[in-house]
Amino acid sequence: YQLGGITPLTKDMTRNIIPTETWSSMLSLVLCALVLVIIFRSLPYGLITLTVALAGIAAEIGFLRIMNWPLDIMTSLVSALVIGVGVNFGILFTYRYIQEMRDGKQGPGDAISSTMNNLGRANVIAAVTTVAAFVIVMFSGIVPLRRFGGVTAVAITICMVTSLTLMPALLYLMSKRAERRAAAVPESEPEPQVT
């Protein structure tokens, strides 16, 4: 005989969350990486853009561990949200940076500075309003909803911080490395003209 009702059903669902969540998050990240590489036509740009989402997921897992909260039905939804928000922040920053490099004919440092001036404030405002909405969810009387709000707020905050710190640093280093490589390649001598 087996017990029926909501308790065994919830227990069974909770037991299946971790492998399902791990698999779906990994698949989402791989597909996002593929799309980003195609959009930017560059493996480095695609992977650097994805770092924002990766930092958000790491923050989610770390915060759950620190708070000793279980991965339940509500907190398992956070990864999907964080991947979406993180990739969005990353795309906006990378796209603007590439535009600044092409249109402004400036070096990586100036392009990062221009990108931060034009986009940094907008990203911060977008993140703060989103985080504020999830902080409000933390005042819910339902414990899983409170956890969901807290974990999501922390993860989105980390996405914002990453998009304004780590990501610009990686873009700068990548561009400087490309400049050094281009400078190391000797220009070919022009062929003599035969008249």
Task: Give names to the regions the model predicted.
Residues 1-195:
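Membrane-embedded transmembrane helical bundles of large multi-pass transporters/channels
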